[in-house]
Amino acid sequence: MNPAVFLSLADLRCSLLLLVTSIFTPITAEIASLDSENIDEILNNADVALVNFYADWCRFSQMLHPIFEEASDVIKEEYPDKNQVVFARVDCDQHSDIAQRYRISKYPTLKLFRNGMMMKREYRGQRSVKALADYIRQQKSNPVHEIQSLDEVTNLDRSKRNIIGYFEQKDSENYRVFERVASILHDDCAFLSAFGDLSKPERYNGDNVIYKPPGRSAPDMVYLGSMTNFDVTYNWIQDKCVPLVREITFENGEELTEEGLPFLILFHMKDDTESLEIFQNEVARQLISEKGTINFLHADCDKFRHPLLHIQKTPADCPVIAIDSFRHMYVFGDFKDVLIPGKLKQFVFDLHSGKLHREFHHGPDPTDTAPGEQDQDVASSPPESSFQKLAPSEYRYTLLRDRDEL
């Protein structure tokens, strides 16, 4: 007969505590540390990856670390598959090559990746566990709204840019490419889809993708490229979803200033769509070749009264065109002059050549004075940049230019 085994009360309590702890303690998600050896493999295999670019000496980075780790734990419980969502980090001092690759100019910087592709918009929201978790949940939500009736297409919000895909089957390569593009561009366009018999009237030549631009009178545009070619499909839809002339708001101002390009801005009243259309047409006609050297923007006069005051204007003066070089602001002449061929283009060229800055300080160039006309001393000090105040704040980030100056 086996001898009886007796446990003391203290031993029994200890055993129960260990058992309960093993059952109810959540598994801590590991933050992937990225380096030049593993970064491509980890990011390429992740549906969604949020990467924290940091430096140990940066106090904002230090404050973010425990928040980032806790948010990772929360999300890991909801998306347990390791490739569904990845939280990762890069020590930019140890891996300066990676920091340069992704043009990191401030710490911490939180960038989102989808299947290895870096999204243009980085995370700039609140640094809290809830905000980060909500952001990831939003990124994991379905980017395409499946319509149940073609009446939904008739009643679309035409103030938005809408991309509609008509497919025979949801389980198809055509739709998978469409959905992947939508996951990247859903902040810029509304994506909708229809399948089977519901979509049949719009599939007279097979699966079909249509762009409906803002405005009831604007004609639809049909995608004619390969439905299974991601790059071609993405480029076509991006061209439609990201306009040449973008609206600047207080929400996206930081993002736009960080692109580092001067602003050519039309200030207009919100309901003045005519001036906006004229400006858009002239930018497309005169300045398409300058797309990589300057940002074309429009702004609500009422919301951006302060920049207008900087150039001695008020909403009553709108529409007004100006350039903000992040050092100074320069005003275009009469808005009607934008219709003069080459006038707007010359204004931008004068910025790049330094003529605008030079003339503000020293008066008109000698070549601009008519023969026999006496030079007038009209030198002045141009208004300081107003939109540079929307740039990343030193109260949220360590800006690398500031550290370089130390």
UniProtKB/Swiss-Prot annotation:
Protein's GO biological process: glycoprotein metabolic process; protein folding; response to endoplasmic reticulum stress; response to unfolded protein
Name this protein carries in UniProt: Endoplasmic reticulum resident protein 44
Region (Disordered): 360-387
Short sequence motif Prevents secretion from ER: positions: 403-406
CDD domains, per database record: PDI_a_ERp44, PDI_b'_ERp44, PDI_b_ERp44
Disulfide cross-links: 189-241, 301-318
Keywords assigned by UniProt, alphabetized: Chaperone, Disulfide bond, Endoplasmic reticulum, Signal
Subunit record text: Forms mixed disulfides with both ERO1A and ERO1B and cargo folding intermediates; the interactions with ERO1A and ERO1B result in their retention in the endoplasmic reticulum. Directly interacts with ITPR1 in a pH-, redox state- and calcium-dependent manner, but not with ITPR2 or ITPR3. The strength of this interaction inversely correlates with calcium concentration.
GO molecular function terms listed in the Swiss-Prot or TrEMBL record: protein disulfide isomerase activity
Signal peptide feature range: 1-29
Expression (tissue specificity): Widely expressed.
Primary localization class, coarse: endoplasmic reticulum
GO CC annotation, single: cell surface
Protein purpose: Mediates thiol-dependent retention in the early secretory pathway, forming mixed disulfides with substrate proteins through its conserved CRFS motif. Inhibits the calcium channel activity of ITPR1. May have a role in the control of oxidative protein folding in the endoplasmic reticulum. Required to retain ERO1A and ERO1B in the endoplasmic reticulum.
The species this protein was found in: Mus musculus (Mouse)
InterPro entries: ERP44, ERp44_PDI_b, Thioredoxin-like_sf, Thioredoxin_domain
